[in-house]
Amino acid sequence: MNVSAVADLSPEARAALFERDAGIEDARESVRDIIGRVREEGDVALRSYAKEFDDVDIGTLAVTDEAERAYDDLDDDLRDAIETAAENIRTFHERQVPDDWREQFDGRELGRRYRPLERVGVYAPGGTAAYPSSVLMGVIPAVVAGVDHVAVATPPAEELPAATLAAAHVAGADAVYQVGGAQAIAALAYGTESVSAVQKVVGPGNRWVTAAKAEVRGDVEIDFLAGPSELLVVCDDTADPELIAADMVAQAEHDPNASVVCVSDDEATAEAVADACERQATARERTEAIESALENDASAVLCARSMSEAVLFAEEYAAEHLSIVAADEEALLDRIDSAGSVFLGGFSPVAVGDYASGTNHVLPTGGLAKVAGGLSVDHFVRSTTVQKLDEDALSSLRETVTTLARAEGLEAHAESVDKRFD
């Protein structure tokens, strides 16, 4: 990787870094066909797609009972790791549960109450690897929120990943289906003979999954449309370049289209990070994906003229993952508002948030962190406002309400208040 100056980036280079999207447009037409077929044919379509896309002949779509058996048969070390991660995730998300409240305001009793959704679907990607962590991240916040029925959909296989099934059991999923891709999103959104329809679908996936979420949005709620993984590192000369590179390579491992960027106000540190990335990318099982991610136009090692310039870059970038490794990291954090999840200091690798620190790894990408946060308990509850007024309280607002209503030409609104004083 070459080091470029932030100030010298061409408009084209800046666009490649900042104009990140989920890359779903070319998938939407085929996804619409899949969704339409699932809505028409139900389980028949799901089995057909399992054979076409996954080369699997599936009988029973629901594999909920297999989850507990997978947990019982799991290797002790992996079981312990899943349970530890689950406990940390649960503890963090329990802190997010909102409390109902009512208060008096000059005779007006106003409040807000929160109620969980009834039915939620969590997509857990599969394909080249099993992702039990995604099951934990999607299911646990829903369970903590009090959702009555949480279903997991994961791609079918001749032998389903035991870790994924076990994670569903540990997290508290009520149903597990061996259905993947856009067809899984369609099944969760609209239901089939075997798959119960839900109110909301959450979880990461490839561009076909993301395109399907975009298509069903409006009929059901979704969390957000997430693209390939992103990491932005802001560091100074106190950072260890080898550790910065290790985090960048780790995120590049996710996807050849991942975006990994480092911005340092120290040129020597930037050069060392670039060199370390190239060295660490080699001789790995996923070297090809890592090297593709490091070499794509959305990845870069940059040198800023000052830490203020680096901070401005970070705020505009609005990364999914933001790592800050600097002498004054807390002060720098105070100056950056837009990021999905922040990792402070040299002992906070992004991987710990991916798995077990307790924060959620389902995060906004493509700059969405400017307006949205990561998956949380908030995604699984709805709020209702409540008001109760006595006669004196309504009387004090009578003129205000009737004047505004008549100014808007809504006489019946005004009369609905006046009649209470006839």
Swiss-Prot record:
Catalytic reaction equation(s): L-histidinol + 2 NAD(+) + H2O = L-histidine + 2 NADH + 3 H(+)
Keyword Cell cycle assigned: no
Cofactor comment text: Binds 1 zinc ion per subunit.
Residues annotated for NAD(+) binding in this entry: Y123, Q183, N206
Cofactors named for this entry: Zn(2+)
Positions of Zn(2+) binding: Q251, H254, D354, H413
Functional pathway: Amino-acid biosynthesis; L-histidine biosynthesis; L-histidine from 5-phospho-alpha-D-ribose 1-diphosphate: step 9/9
Pfam families: Histidinol_dh
Active site, UniProt feature: E320, H321
CDD domains referenced in this protein's UniProt entry, alphabetically: Histidinol_dh
Gene Ontology molecular function terms on file: histidinol dehydrogenase activity; NAD binding; zinc ion binding
Binding site for substrate: S229, Q251, H254, H321, D354, E408, H413
Listed EC numbers: 1.1.1.23
Annotated keywords: Amino-acid biosynthesis, Histidine biosynthesis, Metal-binding, NAD, Oxidoreductase, Zinc
Biological processes per GO annotation: L-histidine biosynthetic process
Acyltransferase listed as a keyword: no
Gene Ontology CC: one annotated term: cytoplasm
Stated role: Catalyzes the sequential NAD-dependent oxidations of L-histidinol to L-histidinaldehyde and then to L-histidine.
The family this protein is said to belong to: Belongs to the histidinol dehydrogenase family.
UniProt protein name: Histidinol dehydrogenase
